[in-house]
Design a protein with these regions (language model features):
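Extracellular/surface-exposed low-complexity segments
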Residues: 73-180
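Generic signature of intrinsically disordered, low-complexity segments enriched in small/polar residues
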Residues: 5, 21, 44, 66-68, ...
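Extracellular beta-strand/beta-solenoid scaffold signature
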Residues: 1-2, 19-37, 52-65, 84-96
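Right-handed parallel beta-helix
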Residues: 7-21, 40-52, 69-82, 104-110
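Extended, compositionally biased low-complexity polar/Lys-Gly-rich tracts
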Residues: 1-4, 31-40, 70, 90, ...
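A detector of low-complexity, intrinsically disordered, Ser/Thr/Gly/Pro/Ala-rich segments
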Residues: 14, 38, 42, 47, ...
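Beta-strand-connecting loop/turn residues
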Residues: 6, 39, 155-157
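Intrinsically disordered, low-complexity regions of eukaryotic proteins
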Residues: 23-24, 49-52, 56, 126, ...
Length: 180
């Protein structure tokens, strides 16, 4: 499904088994199930799972080009989508996002703990705010990129996409002297 204007609503059902391979007449080469170039995509239920795209591409589930409006709510599930070479590629947000947050949360159908949103954001997005609220539902969001994690910040509302501190994750081992 390609969104170039207007509104696409997904309230129930499953988008599965789709594949985005080559650039089509609209210049779309991403978004196995949904490609959002402009317009609005609202997902308050249903699942987007088991879709694929070419190796090295993003958005086997949903690819959001710069600037569009994405609203998530209810028990929406975006998971299990992969590139041809096996990389997790669920909800991917491209470079040049125009707003300070990546996802708007639905006020008509509030996000629930049953939702599952796996996400990958452009590589220069350390500290990018995913949502402006729902810190209690942080675990609904999962990073597709092993170098990033979903976090909250003390004293700030919202959920963030943050580069992992890999040095903090490595245990410190004192040097051991070997006797030969």
């Amino acid at each position: 499904i390609y969104v170039d204007s207007g509104i696409l609503r997904l309230e129930s059902g499953i988008l599965t088994g789709n594949k985005c391979e080559d650039v089509d007449a609209n210049g779309v080469d991403r978004g196995g199930a949904v490609g959002v170039r402009s317009g609005t995509f609202i997902m308050t239920g249903g699942e987007i799972t088991d879709n694929t795209c070419d190796a090295g591409k993003n958005g086997a589930g949903i690819y959001v080009y710069e600037g569009p409006s994405v609203t998530i709510g209810g028990n929406a599930k975006i998971y299990g989508n992969r590139t041809a070479d096996g990389m997790n590629s669920n909800l991917s947000v491209g470079n040049g996002e125009s707003s300070s947050t990546i996802i708007n949360l639905s006020t008509d159908s509030p996000l629930t703990s049953e939702a599952k949103i796996c996400i990958r954001v452009s590589t220069d997005s350390n500290g990018k705010q995913i949502t402006t609220s729902c810190t209690d539902l942080k675990d609904v969001f999962v990073s597709d990129n092993d170098s990033y994690e979903i976090t909250t910040k003390d004293g700030e509302e919202g959920i963030f996409y943050t580069k992992k501190n890999l040095l903090a994750a490595v245990p410190h081992h004192p040097l051991q002297h070997l006797t030969i």
